Amino acid sequence: MFSLQDLCRKNIFFLPNDFSKHTLQWLGLYWKEHGSVHRAEKDSIMIQNELVLSINDALLLAGEEGDTDVVQLLLLWEGNLHYAIIGALKTEKYSLVCEYHSQIQDWHVLLPLIQDPETFEKCHDLSLECDFICLLQHAVKCDMLSILVKYKEDLLNVRIRHRIQSLFVLACENRRFEIIEWIGQNLPIPEPEAIFSIAIVTKDIELFSLGYKLIFDYMQRQGTFQLTNMVRMLLLNRYIGMAIEKGLLPFIVETLKYGGSVNRALSYAVIDNKRKIIDYLVRHENIPRGTIERLLHLAVKKQSSRKTLNLLLSYINYKVKNVKKLVEHVVDHNSTLVLKILLEKKENLVDAVLTRLVKHSTYFRVREFIQEFSISPEKFIKIAVREQKNVLIEAISEDIWENPTERITYLKQIVHTIKYESGRRFLIDIIHSIYQSYSLKHEDILKLAIFYVKYNAITHFKDLCKYLWLNRGTESKKLFLECLEIADEKEFPDIKSIVSEYINYLFTAGAITKEEII
């Protein structure tokens, strides 16, 4: 009969109007001082066919009244026992608590359901293995500020003051803003900066903003957290860096409100290639051109992405004013991507960079740059001649033209294009050193001799004449006559004097007549 009664009670969703109080009591569907009770829906009940309550609210009320029978009925209707126990604790109906005590494995589970601080503390006291700090921790988790207020003096006691930091961190992790503010206004927090790390990790801008309010409005004003201007700026810059690393623009904007450096924010954003942040700050903070160029230098130095470089260049319309500084960074940090971007926009800084490379860098760096930008040998050699880099010219020209005759031929052609005398002399000296290092064919030496005559290279020509006379003797007659004609035409007296000397040798040897000389 009992199981049938339970089955009826569990499944009755409608009570006939003619059920008497006695019948309802017999069925167990009567609540003392409230009237008939039955299920209205799966998770609610109806009292006296009028008042509708959720099953858990009804359990809370039944627990407060200590009505074990109604509690059993509501549990049959799938209510949560925790609410009955909370109600019983509130009104100290401990007999009901004792009856169900064994069914509760962890009393902490009930705490989030409790609104009343006194009941909250009573419930926590039932966890016999827990201490005072555990109570405070759960008060923070469950947003029970009144308990912290109650035990403020205990928290200030030297024995447990060190626990304030962990409670503060717990409040931050659980977003208990009211508790965070109260702690900031009433308790000494050893490391309040923890709020910023938590806010950034959880991407919680409200918590992040509260951190600044806490430090700069509450704690600093009260003297519990003193900051010099330098330390303040260091803190702000640190949080800017953390926010940029995560790409959190609202956090950066919030930091700028408290005196954070927009230039530092832009620098971090450039290094981390955070283009949306860069674009927002440049447009909203009216960043001047000079600052943008400095950011461009930083981007080159840190080898930022193509998109970041493009963005920065777009702000200055791809026109760089401080070319010298940009070139220095390109060379010093071997960062050439910006040159390629500028080339695409018809802005050529390759020559300027090549000049600095030739002047200050190694053979390997120069060769790599020449290959990367497909620079013509003539352009490189002219720059190297201007910078007087003979070893560099010799090494790279040997890479380009392995055959010494071919090398001399091309270098001679470049001499023709050099417009200043000292440059021509410098390159002719290099050509002569190549001649001295290799054994050239006779016809190539003859061509070189004529070349020397045309450019009045007296010493080198004299050297060749000596070689030709010793090794070819009178066979060089035709060359000497041709050189004499050129020297007359160009009015090179020193060359003419050298040639005349060897023509006299030819005449003495009977290899030439007066008529041929005339």
From Swiss-Prot:
ANK repeats: 54-83, 129-158, 261-290, 292-322, 324-351
Alphabetical UniProt keywords: ANK repeat, Repeat
Pfam families cross-referenced by the UniProt entry: DUF249
Transmembrane segments: none
Family membership: Belongs to the asfivirus MGF 505 family.
Role according to the record: Plays a role in virus cell tropism, and may be required for efficient virus replication in macrophages.
Protein name: Protein MGF 505-6R
